[in-house]
A protein has these predicted regions:
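Extended catalytic core of nucleotide-activated donor transferases of GT-like folds
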Residues: 62, 73-92
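Short acidic/histidine-rich motifs immediately flanking catalytic phosphotransfer sites
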Residues: 67-74, 194-198
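Bacterial carbohydrate/catabolite-sensing allosteric modules
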Residues: 7-9, 26-27, 39-56, 89-97, ...
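Amphipathic helical "hinge" segments at domain boundaries
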Residues: 5-66, 70-72
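Short, electropositive alpha-helical surface patch
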Residues: 70-78, 151-158
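Short loop/edge segments at beta-strand edges and connector loops
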Residues: 58-60, 78, 174
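Short secondary-structure boundary/capping segments
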Residues: 13, 65-66, 86-88, 192
Length: 201
């Protein structure tokens, strides 16, 4: 029989339920091991989430998945096409993109200041006495192959070198973004017996 009060559990006995945040990665689990850039981005996000007491659920864009109902938001890491972004919108969760400029599509994003980073690195090389500087760059596409993503470092490199009077289009080597590709590009350049630049960036 009710006697007019409710018994409450002691606060110390209550276990706080962690909020869940999903990470969707554009690289596959295997490719991430060869891509230290995206690997470190993910680790940084997971570390901060842990500090804020969030539980992280990882998904890979190349594997079909069903998002857990408990997820309160989604962090999308990588380069995604407009079509892929539309698919993510159907998840019905708040979206934040990392390394994609999605402001024009109405989603908050975090991007790298490549212009400043490239200028700082190139200025350092020039201060070390490098008079000719080559660029190792790559061409990326979204995982659905719908959009080509230009390397923002290339424009920053070109602008810096033109301003300094050291631009040479023949010193731009284009492959893909992997250590193996970089190795093969440099090896092929050496084998041409052409004069090499003082440094490659």
């Amino acid at each position: 029989r009710s006697i007019g009060y409710t018994k409450h559990q002691k606060i110390g006995n209550l276990k706080k339920e962690k909020h869940q945040v999903a990470i969707i990665q554009w690289v596959s689990e295997e490719d991430e091991l060869d891509d230290i850039y995206y690997y470190n981005i993910r680790l940084g996000i997971e570390k901060r989430a842990q500090e804020l007491d969030y539980e992280i659920l990882r998904y890979f864009n190349d594997i079909p998945f069903n998002l857990a109902e408990e997820v309160i938001g989604v962090i999308c890491i990588g380069k995604f096409s407009k079509s892929q972004i539309s698919d993510f919108e159907t998840l019905g969760k708040p979206l934040v993109f990392v390394d994609s400029d999605t402001l024009t599509q109405g989603h908050p994003c975090v991007t790298t200041d490549f212009e400043n980073a490239v200028q700082t690195a190139l200025q350092y090389l020039k201060n070390q006495g490098c008079q000719s500087i080559g660029l190792l760059t790559g061409e990326e596409k979204t995982t659905d192959l719908q959009e080509i993503i230009p390397d923002p470092r290339r424009r920053a490199y070109r602008n810096f070198c033109i301003e300094e009077g050291i631009y040479d289009a023949n010193l731009i080597l284009t492959g893909n973004f992997s250590a193996q590709s970089g190795y093969e590009l440099i090896k092929a350049k050496i084998e041409t017996k052409e004069k090499l630049p003082d440094a490659f960036f």
